[in-house]
């Protein structure tokens, strides 16, 4: 059975998380130690800035949970706000993690790769085998559905993302477009990063060239002094003003002359409050001026889209958990159903052989009687098998129907109850 034990940003502080942080050079030793714990068969560790979570295939889930808790708290040297999950709930958590539904920023793309890498490294170390490989495959399939069927990974909510979205509405894709960012503060940095992520060519202009150079180095762009702005306006497709006061080059008269020379559209984004770019500049032909109110509307729409996407993603997670539960029920019920079918088939075969001894050897008749007996066994046991699978899914060995089947058919095999050995 799948077991998950760990902590994350939702219930643990940075201080709690950092005492469990696993540097890559310690991962192999940790995997070996955790796999050797009581009740644990296979193990993988997802360790990021926001979480340290252990996923284990356990022959005895209760023992595995206890031993993993003790091991983690021993590593920390104190008690920790650890969560403990089993079976379907452990799988649900893994799906939510891989789909970024548990992330600090909904939709962030890094976690899927981190989960995949964690399980692959565990497999390479010999700590994870077939059971965790199957769990990972199902979780990744669920995460892929969330990414492709919802807007969870597409609806960004930030000033920079909103600025990029507005510019894209006017100019189309920003890849290869030239974006001039005026200023080198936090708003300038965030917007420059988003423009870079859109594969735009970013140039940073600032009164203090050293600050422009630092930001340009961070985003892989160019740095120019602010007095080069008028020259830059002849080339830029997008201008982002993240400075408290607009340079003289953005005045209506100057911009009119620049527009006459450049003869193409330009998007201007004013991030200042009070607004720094004159409204008269925004009224010029081929100028598309956006201010913080425009950005706010885009952000609110993105937030609404993201909330709707999250609801859709939760429904997908529910569907995938149900698939997982059915597969687990099939696996747990298989020994019971197999024994029941084997006994019935053996009885049918004995009766066929007894009939053939009376009727004499006839290969064609034997073939037909075997087929008939097999068909009878399958049809008689189809409904009981279906009911038993559902009973195992609902309650495992504790379900009255399962107990009754074991008694009625005198079976030795029985599925594990939830929380017992898998």
UniProtKB/Swiss-Prot annotation:
Binding site for substrate: 48-51, 103, 108-110, 114
Binding site for NADP(+): 183-188
Catalytic activity: (S)-4-amino-5-oxopentanoate + tRNA(Glu) + NADP(+) = L-glutamyl-tRNA(Glu) + NADPH + H(+)
Enzyme Commission number: 1.2.1.70
Disulfide bridge map: none
Entry annotation: catalytic residues: 49
UniProt pathway: Porphyrin-containing compound metabolism; protoporphyrin-IX biosynthesis; 5-aminolevulinate from L-glutamyl-tRNA(Glu): step 1/2
Site (Important for activity): 93
Superkingdom: Bacteria
Keywords: NADP, Oxidoreductase, Porphyrin biosynthesis
Assembly mode: Homodimer.
PANTHER family per record: GLUTAMYL-TRNA REDUCTASE (PTHR43013:SF1)
Domain free text: Possesses an unusual extended V-shaped dimeric structure with each monomer consisting of three distinct domains arranged along a curved 'spinal' alpha-helix. The N-terminal catalytic domain specifically recognizes the glutamate moiety of the substrate. The second domain is the NADPH-binding domain, and the third C-terminal domain is responsible for dimerization.
Additional information: During catalysis, the active site Cys acts as a nucleophile attacking the alpha-carbonyl group of tRNA-bound glutamate with the formation of a thioester intermediate between enzyme and glutamate, and the concomitant release of tRNA(Glu). The thioester intermediate is finally reduced by direct hydride transfer from NADPH, to form the product GSA.
Function: Catalyzes the NADPH-dependent reduction of glutamyl-tRNA(Glu) to glutamate 1-semialdehyde (GSA).
Official protein name in the record: Glutamyl-tRNA reductase 1
Source species: Anaeromyxobacter dehalogenans (strain 2CP-C)
